[in-house]
Amino acid sequence: SPKVFGPQGPKIDETKILSGHPAEMKLAEFDPAILEPGKYILFTQDVTAAIGPWGASFAANLTPDNETGIGTWQPEMFINALRTGKHLGAGRPILPPMPWEMVGKLTDEDLKAVFAYLKSIPPIKNKVPDPKPLDQLLSSK
């Protein structure tokens, strides 16, 4: 979830809870040498984006917004995505740092409960950027 920063550090921005990486937040400059496998993974200041040897990945909008979130998803789509590690169960890979391998081990009943909770929170319109492969990130530097 996006964060707000105060005197005691970052706190979840409750007006944007579970809405993913803020569309307007740009990635900071970085030294590509630190992305070699076995070195570092970089995170944005609010931990909604990660940069590593795979490229850049962004926290998804998990709110029930029909256009930018999971509003049109069905429980089976959610479960299949977390079991296969594929977006919508058949698309692009779900990238780090999302621990889909661990979450996907939950029972169907537990995953349906998580999905029901996500569908119950307020929808927030936030178009999260698409993942960027490492070569695309490096060519834009």
Q: Can you describe what each PLM-predicted range is?
A:
Residues 58-61, 66-72:
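Mid-length scaffold segments of soluble, non-membrane domains
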Residues 70-82:
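Aromatic- and charge-enriched surface segment that lines or borders ligand/interaction sites
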Residues 65, 84-88:
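Short hydrophobic alpha-helical module
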Residues 1-57, 75-76, 87-141:
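Flexible coil segments in periplasmic/lumen-exposed cytochrome c-class electron-transfer proteins
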